[in-house]
UniProtKB/Swiss-Prot annotation:
Location of the protein in the cell: Cytoplasm
Lineage: Bacteria, Pseudomonadati, Pseudomonadota, Gammaproteobacteria, Lysobacterales
One Gene Ontology term, aspect cellular component: cytoplasm
Name assigned to this protein: Ribosome maturation factor RimM
Keyword presence, Ribosomal protein: no
Location of the PRC barrel domain: 108-180
Known function: An accessory protein needed during the final step in the assembly of 30S ribosomal subunit, possibly for assembly of the head region. Essential for efficient processing of 16S rRNA. May be needed both before and after RbfA during the maturation of 16S rRNA. It has affinity for free ribosomal 30S subunits but not for 70S ribosomes.
Pfam entry (one): PRC_RimM
Domain notes: The PRC barrel domain binds ribosomal protein uS19.
Keyword Transferase: no
PANTHER family: RIBOSOME MATURATION FACTOR RIMM
Superkingdom of origin organism: Bacteria
Oligomer status and interactors: Binds ribosomal protein uS19.
Length: 180
């Protein structure tokens, strides 16, 4: 459940939104929230506002003016108008999104993972491997998970394995053995 006073929203169906984190608990008794952030660095989540928050019930609201700080393994945030622990505990599990348009453009030869999802993947020989399902990081490099006739995990490394990314063609070309 989201607290009263947060503006309800119905996002445009065409506007893509990005999941940046979630509320994982209460901190103290004055309405502060513990957040888990998936941004790099994790405090960058506070730069991208307004947030679209989605409660586990499906209720969505828009929140602006969230302040926060780094605290141990979590971030601590203060939502405008939230001043007690009970309200925060009711928000546990709430997901934090922003509109894709709220993010700055990536640097040349860098990509937001969300922009790569759903792109088609084929080899330099033209063999279709499938569609990007998701990506994950191994620490040393990112890996693109491609779902087609089977699932493949391809290191997202230029120019060794990834030869090109073409958003206009909706295509990633890779140097990859289709039997691997």
């Amino acid at each position: 459940m989201l607290p009263p006073g947060l503006e309800s929203t119905q996002m445009k169906q065409t506007e893509r939104r990005i999941l940046l984190g979630r509320i994982v608990g209460a901190f103290g008794v004055k309405g502060e929230l513990k957040l888990e952030s998936w941004t790099e660095p994790r405090t960058a989540i506070f730069r991208y506002q307004p947030w679209i928050v989605r409660a586990p019930s499906g209720q969505e609201s828009v929140v602006s003016g969230v302040r926060g700080r780094d605290q141990g393994k979590n971030l601590i945030a203060v939502f405008p108008g939230v001043t007690d622990r009970d309200t925060v505990e009711a928000m546990h599990g709430t997901e934090i999104y922003v509109a894709r348009s709220a993010l700055p453009p990536p640097k040349p030869d860098e990509y937001y993972w969300v922009d790569l999802e759903e792109l088609q993947v084929e080899t330099v020989e033209g063999v279709k491997l499938g569609t990007v399902s998701h990506l994950f990081s191994t620490g040393s490099n990112d890996v693109v998970v491609v779902r087609g006739d089977r699932e493949r995990m391809i290191p997202f490394v230029f120019p060794d394995f990834v030869k090109s990314v073409d958003f206009d063609a909706n295509l990633i070309v890779v140097d990859w053995d289709p039997d691997f």
